[in-house]
Amino acid sequence: MNVLFAGGGTGGHLYPAIAMAGELRKLVPDVVISFVGTTGGIEATEVPRLGYRLHLIPVRGLKRGRALADIVANIGVIADFVAALGRAAALIAREAPDVVVGTGGFVSAPLLLAAQLMRKKTLIQEQNAFPGVTTKLLAALASEVHLSFDDARRFIRNKKRLFVTGNPARSFALPQQVAAREYFALSEERPTLLVFGGSRGARSINNAVLEGVDLITASANLVWQTGALDFERIKSKMQPSPYIWVAPYIEEMGVAYGAADLVLCRAGASSLAELTNLGKPSVLVPYPYATGDHQRHNARALVTGGAAMLVEDDRLGQQASIKNILELLHDKERLKRMGAASRKLAYPDSAHQLALRIISLAKKN
């Protein structure tokens, strides 16, 4: 069996593909797996590091502005896409995959379209509650479309071969909460707030937490991933406290989740998959400039399900917002209900189920 994964640019598009590839290797040890990406994406280093073959195809995304410069730039983007489509077709002809899997990012569009035109089996895995342009345009021609959120169904016109299988996420073995707090040298009696904004951090979240850090540490522990770009600035403005653990990046994320009673973070699809798989209650701050405002759609899915509270990015810095977060952090019964609701939204075997669907499609050739 030969499977070609097309997706990347960011971890949110790449890691679901890596999770599916890992499951395929368990189920079909002799499977041939390769990836297609771009030189500027995270896949350029991550895929070879994991031992998979990587094919590179230059492709860019459309500019969404209406300025003359954007229009002119998009002419070049379209020309690049046509060239990428030709390269994709040549790659598919050479590699002869049984299934082409698209997980988003600029490179997935030419690969999926070429595969569909060549009558190859294709599977689209959409991470967000508001599907991307590639998913919406190519869903009708796909062999199967797999969504992470049930709410995303309404954006897909062709409901045939449409499945909700969740978003493959990292798995963690959570330590006992007491042991997790000991790892961070924090108080065992206080509730713990875990804050992160992705590996690169989130400036507005960092600013809000820095502004309210005295209020937070007056009654709670704080485990805080600032991101590399903000760490030195944050560190220089903080007073030492036995109730704070701060770092640019949390290597032992499972321990951090284990210590946390409540999580404050962005509403990226991968983070939400981790939160629901672990049954963690959360306060979500959607990134306001996300394409199609997809993080707000993601957050609303959890809020509607009773698993999260939503705070707008421009309101997070207000003292009232920090007080509301702390009020929730100290409300054990509400946190318990939210945690149970979070777990109900989970798809913990998402990668396995998707791998089974890929195998099923391959057998139909």
Swiss-Prot record:
**Compartment list:** Cell inner membrane
Coarse class of the primary localization is: membrane
Q: Which reaction does it catalyse?
A: di-trans,octa-cis-undecaprenyl diphospho-N-acetyl-alpha-D-muramoyl-L-alanyl-D-glutamyl-meso-2,6-diaminopimeloyl-D-alanyl-D-alanine + UDP-N-acetyl-alpha-D-glucosamine = di-trans,octa-cis-undecaprenyl diphospho-[N-acetyl-alpha-D-glucosaminyl-(1->4)]-N-acetyl-alpha-D-muramoyl-L-alanyl-D-glutamyl-meso-2,6-diaminopimeloyl-D-alanyl-D-alanine + UDP + H(+)
What Enzyme Commission number does this protein have?
Answer: 2.4.1.227
> Which molecular-function annotation in GO is an example for this chain?
undecaprenyldiphospho-muramoylpentapeptide beta-N-acetylglucosaminyltransferase activity
Top enzyme class: transferase
**List of residues binding UDP-N-acetyl-alpha-D-glucosamine:** T10, G11, G12, N128, R170, S199, I250, Q295
Signal peptide start and end residues: none
Pathway as given in its UniProt record: Cell wall biogenesis; peptidoglycan biosynthesis
Name the UniProt key words of this record, in alphabetical order: Cell cycle, Cell division, Cell inner membrane, Cell membrane, Cell shape, Cell wall biogenesis/degradation, Glycosyltransferase, Membrane, Peptidoglycan synthesis, Transferase
What NCBIfam families has UniProt attached to this entry? murG
- Which family does this protein fall into? Belongs to the glycosyltransferase 28 family. MurG subfamily.
Q: What does this protein do?
A: Cell wall formation. Catalyzes the transfer of a GlcNAc subunit on undecaprenyl-pyrophosphoryl-MurNAc-pentapeptide (lipid intermediate I) to form undecaprenyl-pyrophosphoryl-MurNAc-(pentapeptide)GlcNAc (lipid intermediate II).
Q: What is this protein called?
A: UDP-N-acetylglucosamine--N-acetylmuramyl-(pentapeptide) pyrophosphoryl-undecaprenol N-acetylglucosamine transferase
- What is the source species? Pelodictyon phaeoclathratiforme (strain DSM 5477 / BU-1)
Protein's gene? murG
